[in-house]
Amino acid sequence: MLPHKCMEEHDYPGLRFTLIGTLDGLRQKVKIDISTGDAITPQAVEYRYPLMFEDRSLQIMSYNLETLLAEKLENIMYRGTSNTRMRDFYDIYMLTGKPGIAINDATLYRAFLATSNTRRTTEFIPQFASTLESVESNTEMQKIWNKFCNDNDYVLE
């Protein structure tokens, strides 16, 4: 396992670790990004990650849901139609469309402002609605989305 730089465009680049696990001949890659300097609004949350083959879980500190969504929204706002990260669109759709997932709108708003401020992209906020319209109507974005759907079986579920 070797770390690679990630988020190099930020003032506080992070590291990405790619782990490869094997079980009965099956190989699975797991990518873990570690970064510093992100605005977590209001704070990190404790997350228990249940292990698949043991009766225990790992405790990790993670972004709260609103900060996770804010980072994805900020990326969409900033990159607009040059965004090729379809996973962000999919994640937003899944996280906001599932019953039982509670999103605090006020916290999301504060997290979005904090993320935009940290990334120095607040100047793009007034045009965000028109950026979304451009993304939605852009034929190249639609082609990239269709390819993402075809390449990832889980999208169709």
Pin down the residues of each PLM region.
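Structured mid-to-C-terminal alpha-helical surface segments
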Residues: M1-E157
